[in-house]
Amino acid sequence: MRRMNELMKILGQTGQAMTFDQIKIQLASSEQIRSWSYGEIKKPETINYRTFKPERDGLFCARIFGPIKDYECLCGKYKRMKFRGIICEKCGVEVTLAKVRRERMGHIELASPVAHIWFLKSLPSRIGLMVDMTLKDLEKILYFESYVVLEPGTSPLKQFSLLTEDQYLDVMDEHGDDGIEVGIGAEAIKKVLERIDCKADKERLRQELKDTTSEAKRKKLVKRLKLIEAFADSESRPEWMIMDLIPVIPPELRPLVPLDGGRFATSDLNDLYRRVINRNNRLKRLIELRAPDIIVRNEKRMLQESVDALFDNGRRGRAITGANKRPLKSLSDMLKGKQGRFRQNLLGKRVDYSGRSVIVVGPELKLHQCGLPKKMALELFKPFIYSKLEKYGHATTIKAAKRMVEKERPEVWDILEEVIREHPVMLNRAPTLHRLGIQAFEPVLIEGKAIQLHPLVCTAFNADFDGDQMAVHVPLSLEAQLEARVLMMSTNNILSPANGKPIIVPSQDIVLGLYYLSLETPEFLATPDRNEYDAEGRLTVTGASSFATIGEVEYALSAGAIKLHDKIVARFDTVDAEGKPVRQTVITTPGRMLIAQILPRHPAIPFSLINKQLTKKNVSDVIDAVYRHCGQKECVIFCDRMMGLGFRHAAKAGISFGKDDMIIPAEKKVLVERTAAEVKEFEQQYQDGLITAGERYNKVVDAWSRCTDEVQAAMMKEISRQEVGKVTNSVWMMSHSGARGSPAQMKQLAGMRGLMAKPSGEIIEQPIIANFKEGLSVLDYFTSTHGARKGLADTALKTANSGYLTRRLVDVAQDCIIVEDDCGSERGLTVRAVMDGGEIVSSLSERILGRTVAADILDPATGEVLFKRDTLIEEAQAEKIEKAGVESVLIRSVLTCESRVGVCGLCYGRDLARGTPVNIGEAVGVIAAQSIGEPGTQLTMRTFHIGGAAQRGAEQSMVEASRDGHVTINNRTIVHNSQNVPIVMSRNCEIVLTDDKGVERARYRVPYGARLLVEEGAAVTRNQKLAEWDPYTLPIITEHSGTVEYLDLIDSITLVERMDEVTGLTSKVVVDYKQAAKGVDLRPRLQLKDANGHVIKLSNGNDARYFLSPDSLLSVENGAQVSAGDVLARIPREGSKTRDITGGLPRVAELFEARRPKDHAIISETDGRVEFGKDYKAKRRIIVKNDETGEETDYLIPKGKHVSVQEGDFVRVGDPLVDGPRVPHDILKVLGVEALSDYLVNEIQDVYRLQGVKINDKHIEVIVRQMLQKVEILEPGDTTYLIGETVDRIEFETENTKRLNMGERPAQAMPVLQGITKASLQTQSFISAASFQETTRVLTEAATAGKKDTLNGLKENVIVGRLIPAGTGSVMNKLRAIAAGQDRQRLAQARPVVSKAD
């Protein structure tokens, strides 16, 4: 084999990336470093400045590293190939290839050992953990500030205690002959490390762990134990962290390049190496001269510092700078960051055969074509042209061919045409946010210098023609061309991988043209369907004209007999289910007949599909239907024709934009005046002390935002009015069709601009009443500048943040690949329609489409099985399930998939971009990451302060029925107040609307204290009010009548009277009682007594006591009589600035990073009754006591938080005790994986839904699966795990199976949720983690543990230069594994023959 390798070297085929299965990283011993080295470097010189030859024994020495020219020694005695392998006796250089200078290493023998800075300073310090010292003490020893006692002997000193210079001298005087051993510097630490016996220490520490009780000590021991175990298992020795010699990397990797003018450009590493060599040589000389100790020690310290700088400059002390005052780039910096080796050269490479140019629109191209400028094509396809020129005998040599191409001879162009035929090229537009950012096209040669792009693919590329540039790449090999054609051709990417909807949809002008064609004019609606005659048979009303064929319609159109929008009766030819032609008579317009003409004939595509006004959404539905029923080819042809039709008629229609198209509604003045009056009224209420300042502000902002909406509605009504004889408003057509503009933009042009936000995000309560058509006043203009500027600044930030989110997502999900068809999992997720405020936001059929059924679906009415387990739900099945009235379906999900690596096909379901079951080898993780990250730039950056600027809707203060139905009230606990209105007393009351069949259609939460306006079982109509409440305060309501008594409400300690400066009215407010005298355990509350002075008992058996949290406003006096349903106190919900709702991108990032939100909810972990325990310092104690088991769970809650439960309330698992956003970790711990996935999917979908972005749930599930890769050990059983250790889930399951098979106790663990950054850094693969973030830390950790990287993910494989194990690469991997096995067998059989050749 060795011979074979040498032969390969001569042929220039060195080391293939395919010949290994895993990569291991570990510490190198001095012997290993010596074995790599080809010689010791003794001098700091680089090259001779006169001869430019490398100095002997210097950093570029040819004797050590190899010759400078191929097969030529330095002195020139031996030249040419025939002397290969000879070592020149004069200059000592081996005659071989010059490229060995890229692979041969040297070394420097150090005069004194030095510590490796990575293992010293990377936290936690590995050397520190091994010797059990703090980093501070270690540094004192290593940098020669303090001595350390290694062996106390018989002296009273402790082992490893530090001594200063003076103490050291005293100790040596006193105990010099007691066998004491004291050391300093790296030598001392090395001695300590040498004495460590990992195996024995491991046992000792395990024992100590069992015996220890203190938590802090346990944590420390666990850390140490893990490290010592890693050393024991990996055959590394701890003393290797201290180096006796350092390797020198090959000279070609740190080149010295002569510039013109006799100067040299050099890599920073050479400077760093030179410092090390200089100091090392000086130290050697000082030791030989027997210099005083202090000088030697100083030199040793400097040597340590220079080695530190070489490995990681700037990690300790000031960074060493070069001549131009910038820090030198050390070995660590070469790997780190965006410019480091990993991200710059290994993950992203520049490629040849590529070019870029500006793009222009190419409306006459077919969908699979792009226009490529001739000049570019000539350059890109040069080698192909040369070979063809030779083949056809136009040129005899490559040189001649080259000349012909340079002169651009006519035959060259003919050959170019031939070369390009059916050779796809790839177009890419940066930023490539999802896989549709690179697509393949067939080039069409064009004149000019700009690339032509098909208009329909612009959506996928997110391209427009305002100067965008695109890059072209040529796939060279046949396999690459095949992949480009089969997988990446634009015609194969009709559906979006994010949501399975068509992405090749017409937009802008095309939509406008189609909308205009299919317009319903008032004349159309006024024309009757047929002619009407009177009794004498005279024509009284002219109806729609009739036509027999589409041809006749076209003829009449061109003759001017009918107009595009007249009503006609025509015949439409289509086919039935058997494929036989049928004709149907339709009432329609000539315009729609033109669209029908290009429609594919198919029974599932009826004329009614286009016999309506075609808005952008309708057009998308048509394309979707054509794709689903007629297949891809028909769909592509249809899209191209549709584009042509749309463009042609948009041009003919001549729809334009005039200022008079913007109509200011007449009602505007009335609406504004009415709102101004309301605002005045609120001001008055505030002056009279009926409402607080915060409430007034809230009400004012609400009133204005309602007014703006009403003005907008009036304007839209005005603009969309159609009258006979009048042309339809152009601007309305543009907006309504979805071509351009939105009601929100039109509102600013012709309605009123509305509310604006201040820099802090608060809303300015004075709105801009004017619009752009009327013109803004100076003050209006000034108010609006801020918002406009913030918008621009936000956009810039947003792009960066969104890109970073995508990067983290890709990193965490990159190794999630479909590995098998079925994992056989029995588990799944229960899915139901998503409701929001009673509206169905996403129906059940939408959510289960393209998923696999996990358990048989039964018809709720008959109980028969609709669909069996493992059925893939297609459109038809989803509709059937929805029609049957099924409420929830158990579907398989990647979260419950039991595949060991990757996921299985059935758990994933349909491949959204193809509409078929997913293939093995599909990289679903990366697709998920791209689908979530790509719309990131469309999300907002703002943190909404209760519903951000000007977008805020009015506070919700009532529930209206969204449809007709019957009312059911869940958890109905009510009292009737003095007006006999029922008041809701339960914390989780819900109103459910059901239809006639009893199927739930809407569900509304009704808050505590709301007034119920309907009874159980009542029939309600749409928009009927069901309940209402005050949105600005949380009330505390009594359920009994009685006399109020204040408890612990002591003036100026817990209760103050606050006077409002503006109104002069006072209110009683409960304050935080920190000033109270110690020992007085005050808990402000109200209690109710009956006529006899006894405390009233409530229905649940508790006393009627109501606890008051700080900031409550009391509504009753001490001793007052109250009746049931009265409000005792109210807690204001602070307006504008209350809890900030984190919205948009930051919210998505917060969820994926699994951060604990500010002011989060505290949820109950058990069922039980609430009791208030004894307070603890600044916290309140809530106890939840389970009645059956008698278990008690304590919760400590900061005093300022509002507790949402009262004493004696019954809470269930997962109910909030304190309101606020929920913490995902708590949900996982208390309610399990399914609830967590439900929560995360819904929260993330809410953010995207707000922007109208559709993403399939399964993408979010894939990411959540990756966040749940680890488990935390609760009970180690007989395994070697430690309590509290986080272990990989798969590793944990393997270990447990092993223990069970051996008849031992398995470990127990619970799943932990990790944020995406943390999960990426803790993947199995250290290469992937190192190329993500914190490179040095990851590599340090991997090296001490002697980690192996088995190259399972995509990223590791890209880095080592193999095909990725996904897509076509997964097949290749399998084949390669089989082939390698066969090769081994053959080699084994042929071995004796090889040895003879030796």
Swiss-Prot record:
Record-linked HAMAP family: RNApol_bact_RpoC (MF_01322)
Residues noted as binding Mg(2+) in the record, renumbered to the chain: 464, 466, 468
Top-rank EC class of the record's enzyme: transferase
Keyword DNA repair: no
One Gene Ontology biological process: DNA-templated transcription
Protein's name in the database: DNA-directed RNA polymerase subunit beta'
Catalytic activities: RNA(n) + a ribonucleoside 5'-triphosphate = RNA(n+1) + diphosphate
Keyword annotations of the record: DNA-directed RNA polymerase, Magnesium, Metal-binding, Nucleotidyltransferase, Transcription, Transferase, Zinc
EC number: 2.7.7.6
Cofactor dependency: Mg(2+); Zn(2+)
Annotated Gene Ontology cellular component terms: DNA-directed RNA polymerase complex
Protein source organism: Gluconacetobacter diazotrophicus (strain ATCC 49037 / DSM 5601 / CCUG 37298 / CIP 103539 / LMG 7603 / PAl5)
Assembly information from the UniProt record: The RNAP catalytic core consists of 2 alpha, 1 beta, 1 beta' and 1 omega subunit. When a sigma factor is associated with the core the holoenzyme is formed, which can initiate transcription.
Gene3D superfamilies xrefs: 1.10.132.30, 1.10.150.390, 1.10.1790.20, 1.10.40.90, 2.40.40.20, 2.40.50.100, RNA polymerase II, clamp domain, RNA polymerase Rpb1, domain 3
Binding site for Zn(2+) 2: 823, 897, 904, 907
